[in-house]
Amino acid sequence: MKRYIRIVAMSLLYGLVFVGCGAKGNDAKDVKVDAKTELDQVNKEDKKSLTVFAAASMTESLTEIKDEFEKENPGVNLVFNFDSSGTLKSQIAEGAACDVFISAASKQMDELDPTSGKKDSDLEIDPDSRFNLLENEVTLAVKEDSSKDIKSFEDLNTNLVETIALGNADVPVGQYSESLLKNMGIWDAIKGKITFGSNVKEVTSWISEGAVDCGIIYSTDAKAAGLKIVAKADPTLLDKKVIYPAAVLKDSKNREDADKFISFLNSDKAREIFEKYGFKQAE
């Protein structure tokens, strides 16, 4: 049936282009564009969709990886859902269709992993498919043209800083930030300066717009937004490494392509793209 539809669509395309030859100017162009759009839609419907839920901090890198993966797998259409890892995990637990999950922290993946002892959902990942994909860094960032002479995390507890943007407690970047500031002993002192964002992209946006003096985000987001990194967190002051685990959902309706995508994420081509955006390969 799909083949029949494609043949009809192609016939329609050639017919419309032929008719368009008799038209003039913009009318002919419009006919060709409309026909091409219809054919593109038919071709898209012929592809199998693979739904990937991924941490918001991976937006730029995975969008580029999508193009490379689809070149090698022309029968697959990658569909992304980017948000905070906590939000994505909740959506999966509530039954949202998802084939692959990539979190910005182990916590959210553990809550879907039947072998972790922390699982809190009926839906779950396939633990055999789980692996640590990437590592990131927690940084203090300001606008490139900021007039504030902020140079360190310690400056957050001075008059240099009036407003700070952090991710909220449900967001991995917020959890990393809170553990860092508590371990530094300045969390309680600066709480009144903090504005909380729903995910790392919102925090990054506030810094870029100058809505806050500074913010704590991943190095990859600072780089993508053209922000100035003034300090990087001491790893010993974080409760855990900033690790991005990936896994296939047990209920995936497209397991074969999900496995292909997981494999592609480990390829040299994907690693090159991740490194371009500032990610490190997880050890």
Q: What feature does the model see in each segment?
A:
Residues C21-E70, G86, S106, P114, ...:
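Exported/periplasmic ABC-transporter solute-binding proteins
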Residues K48, A96-C98:
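Short acidic/histidine-rich motifs immediately flanking catalytic phosphotransfer sites
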Residues D67-V79:
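Signal peptide-proximal N-terminal region
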Residues M1-N26:
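Sec-dependent N-terminal signal peptides of Gram-positive bacterial secreted proteins and lipoproteins
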Residues F82-K89, C98-D113:
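Ligand-binding clamshell of periplasmic/extracellular solute-binding protein-like
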